[in-house]
UniProtKB/Swiss-Prot annotation:
Name by which UniProt lists this protein: Cytochrome b6-f complex iron-sulfur subunit
UniProt KW keywords: 2Fe-2S, Disulfide bond, Electron transport, Iron, Iron-sulfur, Membrane, Metal-binding, Thylakoid, Translocase, Transmembrane, Transmembrane helix, Transport
Record GO terms (molecular function): 2 iron, 2 sulfur cluster binding; electron transporter, transferring electrons within cytochrome b6/f complex of photosystem II activity; metal ion binding; monooxygenase activity; oxidoreductase activity, acting on paired donors, with incorporation or reduction of molecular oxygen; plastoquinol--plastocyanin reductase activity
First-listed, main subcellular location of the protein, grouped into a coarse class: membrane
Cofactor binding notes: Binds 1 [2Fe-2S] cluster per subunit.
Topology term for the membrane: Single-pass membrane protein
Highest taxon in the source lineage: Bacteria
Organism: Synechococcus sp. (strain JA-2-3B'a(2-13)) (Cyanobacteria bacterium Yellowstone B-Prime)
Enzyme Commission number: 7.1.1.6
Catalyzed reaction equations: 2 oxidized [plastocyanin] + a plastoquinol + 2 H(+)(in) = 2 reduced [plastocyanin] + a plastoquinone + 4 H(+)(out)
GO cellular component annotations of the record: plasma membrane-derived thylakoid membrane
């Protein structure tokens, strides 16, 4: 019987070829790592939440009671809650009732959480000084857009957040 014997051998890899391959691989990893956030920035976020929305929760994850909320807060207060996708979201109290909208508390400039300033009746970003009116409309600073709106409805004794549908009433 005849055996087929292959005399093919790979040529030995020189140091130069090995170092070039390692350097190219390293540069490729760095370039891909640097491009990922850039590409992610240009892809719009999904709407999040479901059609039914999400019950607003306090910092401990307990549903917020509307009756308790209105009894313990001023008639024009803004109360921080966990909103859609876990983002900090303000429940807006206007004239002693829960408004039909809430405000995402994340600054549109660089993503800081914007606290409500009761004394000045506005939101002030501690990072770069952006200021927002009581309805979330940007009034000063580097922030490019107003705070994002979410729909807020009273469901029994709870506040339910859902994605905002329709035009921004603050722009009219």
């Amino acid at each position: 019987m005849t055996e087929a014997v292959s005399n093919f051998e790979a040529p030995p890899m020189s140091r130069r070829v090995l170092l070039n391959a390692l350097l190219s691989g390293s540069v490729g990893v760095v370039v891909v790592g640097a491009l990922y956030p850039v590409v992610k920035y240009f892809i719009p976020p999904s709407a999040g939440g479901g059609g039914e929305g999400l019950i607003a929760q306090d910092a401990l994850g307990k549903p917020i009671s509307v009756s308790e909320l209105l009894a313990t807060h001023a008639a024009t207060d803004r109360v921080l809650a966990q909103g859609l996708k876990g983002d900090p979201t303000y429940i807006v109290i206007d004239n002693g009732a829960v408004a039909n909208y809430g405000l995402n508390a994340v600054c549109t400039h660089l993503g800081c959480v914007v606290p409500w300033n009761v004394g000045e009746n506005l939101f002030k970003c501690p990072c770069h000084g952006s200021q927002y009116a009581a309805n979330g409309k940007v009034i000063r600073g580097p922030a490019p857009r107003s705070l994002e709106l979410v729909s807020a409805t009273v469901d029994g004794d709870n506040v339910r957040f859902s994605p905002w549908q329709g035009p921004d009433f603050r722009e009219t």
